[in-house]
Amino acid sequence: MKKITIALLIGLFATVSVNAQMKEGKIVYERKINMWKMITDPEMRTRIPEFRTSEFELLFNEQASLFRSVPEDEAPDPFANSGGGGGPRFMFRMPETTTFTDLATQMQYESRPMFEKTFLIVDSLKPLKWKISEETKTIAKHVCKKATTTVTAQNVRIGGTGGFRLGRNNNDTAKGSTVITPKETEVIVWYTQDIVASVGPDNYTGLPGAILEVDLDNGANIITATEVSSKYAKKDLVQPTKGERMNKAQFQDTMKKLMEDMQKGGGMGGMRIRMGNN
């Protein structure tokens, strides 16, 4: 009789544990970009904060997810406590993007405002080859496992003038321009099985749970969950439809042409720059 009672209790606790797994909700992330890893000019570094932080949120259920940036109108001045020298200072504001992922069809719809227009980038998700580790750590009160993969990312190097060039090697930055080249990059993520949905920030999915942290290129770009909640605005979890529709390859070709035009005429497109003085 005791054995039966113990077995029933174990079964009950197992059921409770499974039911406790989140199937829908919201994850708030902080993205921290190391700007100095892109900037080679020492003088320009004194005018730009080492780290650029921004906030994002991921709305999700078992069918879809929506990753979007949080408005930065009230963002604090990163130079407020830096103690930097005088002269003009640069603050970079990235365009506010929205990425919707249909988990059933593995299709992604990204609305991206750039160059005074909106692009709707529609394409299938590229499966990532994850290597899962048993190493764990806690993020936002959730135990996470480690996984790694490699991706081809855009390697950006900014020289002294800030002009744009599509170069082939980092030596081009000595000419005082910005060089964008493809680069094989390691990605380390931490995911939790406390959340059933296979979701994550940006294009990072495909693990048995939700990704709560992404480390791209050894700290160059880190996205970390700061809050996880079962409550979210369900009405906002919808596929974007507005914008000039194209796939990722077409978008990359369009960006290449626009960057070349920027090199000739100047401008930063959808990226905003604020300048000020100490």
Language-model regions, residue ranges each:
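Extended soluble regions of mature proteins
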Residues: 22-278
